[in-house]
Amino acid sequence: MSVLETFDPAVAEVIRQETERQEYNLELIASENFVSPAVLEAQGSVLTNKYAEGYPGKRYYGGCHCVDVVENLAIDRAKELFGADHVNVQPHSGSQANMAVYFSVLKPGDTVLGMNLAHGGHLTHGSPVNFSGKLFNIVPYGVSKETQTIDYEETERLALEHKPKMIVVGASAYPRIIDFEAFRRIADKVGAVVMVDMAHIAGLVAAGLHPSPVPYAEFVTTTTHKTLRGPRGGMIMCREDWAKTLNSNIFPGIQGGPLMHVIAAKAVAFKEALTPEFKQYQGQIVKNAKALAEGLTKRGFKLTSGGTDNHLMLVDLSQTELTGKVAEEALDRAGITVNKNGIPFDTRSPFITSGIRIGTPAATSHGLKEAEMEQVAGFIAEVLGNVSDEAKLAAVKTQVNALMKRFPMYANRLV
């Protein structure tokens, strides 16, 4: 029995159940992934005990010589990985990373061009319910109704009309390559700063499978989980002339002490991302996404923009009797985890939606490849064709569990 099982069996049991869910269910949420045992070990280390306000060599606490080393490792590895001038690894999340950039560049009321959440953007890109939409004048851009890809001509028109101080680029539900160079050209016409939020595609960028935003943006933010396969957290890269301003807007601007155990886990993840095996893994994520997209398309499902270039796809259910909410719940009962998601120009509420978002990073971490993606497409079709038939959903769940048992990841933690 572990120390936790002895002292707090209730929490230990929840962890056991969640480990079992991650091990035997099929995780297809595009923003989720499974970290390596090395990352888990670093995050669960005694570094969680150490306060370290400030930056390496300039702390407000004593006894920081060890955590200084680990933070510098994370910074140096991130610089090598992405070719950035300056890196701050202290943000607790992607949202806080974005907030720090807003506060570095803008004053309340300044105009920002950001991707419409309903078209695939993110809450922090200007949603009215988020700090970004409450503090700044947001002008949303989006996708073309015909192609369902970013409308660069319309974005340029909006920029010329509204003269934003900053243009926010990036998405949380966009399956195509983003043209960062085009956004740079637009920004230069109006003297705007470019901030790219590459949270979803950071792993693909690191592996050279998506163009890098670093040459085109003053700031690049990302989470360190998702495709990057590190711990849950954030990171910011910027040009050297913004470094001092950025650092002061993280600490003491919006955060106090950094989470040193998480920064250690980030350092480990960045080392993993510098390996040839990581590049192969990212390539498999994209191959799996394309295989799954093809499998769904040939079974009659409509995908926004017609497919995918990256790790995710949006299944458009608007021409069916299903809603995203019903589809998500039915798939969950069959052991397949996705999330309901709005599609461009959706007429349903965000709590109901006309689509589901599907991604392949977590399944690829388990070891699934194209042949398994064909099976997965069949599972999804079977479930969505029988959302009210509990016997059929149970049968699919049995097949899902059998499939996942062939690709163990954390099974040793269930012993």
From Swiss-Prot:
Molecular-function annotations in GO: glycine hydroxymethyltransferase activity; pyridoxal phosphate binding
Compartments where found: Cytoplasm
Pfam family, one: SHMT
Pathway(s) the chain acts in: One-carbon metabolism; tetrahydrofolate interconversion; Amino-acid biosynthesis; glycine biosynthesis; glycine from L-serine: step 1/1
Family matches, as SUPFAM superfamilies: PLP-dependent transferases
Binding site for (6S)-5,6,7,8-tetrahydrofolate: 117, 121-123, 349-351
GO cellular component: cytosol
Cofactor: pyridoxal 5'-phosphate
Record's catalysed reaction(s): (6R)-5,10-methylene-5,6,7,8-tetrahydrofolate + glycine + H2O = (6S)-5,6,7,8-tetrahydrofolate + L-serine
Location, primary (coarse class): cytoplasm
Residue numbers bearing the N6-(pyridoxal phosphate)lysine modification: 226
Function in brief: Catalyzes the reversible interconversion of serine and glycine with tetrahydrofolate (THF) serving as the one-carbon carrier. This reaction serves as the major source of one-carbon groups required for the biosynthesis of purines, thymidylate, methionine, and other important biomolecules. Also exhibits THF-independent aldolase activity toward beta-hydroxyamino acids, producing glycine and aldehydes, via a retro-aldol mechanism.
NCBIfam families: PRK00011.1 (NF000586)
Family that this chain belongs to: Belongs to the SHMT family.
Protein name (database record): Serine hydroxymethyltransferase
Recorded name of the encoding gene: glyA
